[in-house]
């Protein structure tokens, strides 16, 4: 939480004092379960309820920036589910695409968590998956367009199911889909 709140705040304050463009990574995780929608309007920000410490720490900085009235001078980017090359160093925090690729390569099967939410069948849980190069292009656009400031969502704007994503990885690897549903660990339930 220190990295995502205190250190980000200190860096932001330094940038503001020294007239340096400040663009920071917030997260789609700040939206919690999505029941309040995904509007990046400032008026919605105080009402959000993240589900985990990561989302909460990102949300705390968004709230600080809003309350300090500095969102007119900085840019916050709420990245959704970014995937792409060179993720192995992220361990358990790698994208589902990266995990699926490894599972298919080594085991020939993708293991997805069963749904514990009554509105979603197993594998029908949805996320907005955005390719890392598209996320980088968004960052570069904001770096080049200094007149633009505020809090912005960075995603495709379209949700896909876990099953759709797994099938796409199988197709990209030229293999038939083989998906197994496993129980979600208790400590993760209600957190994602």
Give the ranges of each region predicted by the language model:
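Structural signature of the Rossmann-like NAD(P)-dependent dehydrogenase/reductase core
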Residues: 22-26, 75-81, 128, 153-154
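Active-site Tyr-X1-5-Lys
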Residues: 33, 49-80, 99-106
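Short-chain dehydrogenase/reductase
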Residues: 2, 50-59, 90-98, 128-129, ...
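Conserved sequence/active-site signature of Rossmann-fold short-chain dehydrogenase/reductase
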Residues: 30-31, 82-84, 135
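Short, solvent-exposed loop/turn segments at secondary-structure boundaries
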Residues: 87-92, 191-192
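Conserved Rossmann-fold NAD(P)-dependent oxidoreductase catalytic core, especially the SDR/UDP-sugar
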Residues: 9-51, 75
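C-terminal substrate-binding subdomain of Rossmann-fold SDR/epimerase-dehydratase oxidoreductases
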Residues: 104-192
């Amino acid at each position: 939480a220190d990295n995502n709140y205190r250190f980000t705040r200190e860096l932001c304050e330094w940038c503001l004092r020294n007239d340096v463009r400040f663009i920071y990574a917030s997260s789609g995780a700040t939206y919690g379960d999505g029941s309040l929608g995904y509007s990046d309007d400032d008026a919605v920000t105080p009402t959000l309820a993240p589900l985990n410490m990561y989302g909460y720490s990102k949300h705390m900085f968004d709230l600080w920036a809003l309350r300090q009235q500095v969102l007119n001078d900085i840019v916050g980017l709420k990245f959704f589910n970014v995937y792409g090359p060179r993720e192995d160093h992220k361990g358990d925090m790698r994208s589902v695409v990266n995990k699926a690729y490894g599972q298919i390569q080594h085991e020939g099967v993708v293991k997805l968590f069963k749904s514990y939410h009554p509105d979603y069948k197993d594998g029908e849980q949805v996320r907005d998956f955005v390719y890392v190069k598209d996320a980088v292009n968004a960052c570069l656009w904001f770096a080049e367009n200094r007149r633009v400031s505020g809090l912005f969502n960075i995603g495709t704007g379209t949700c896909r199911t876990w099953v759709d994503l797994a099938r796409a990885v199988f197709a990209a690897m030229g293999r038939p889909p083989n998906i197994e549903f496993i129980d979600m660990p208790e400590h993760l339930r209600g957190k994602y």
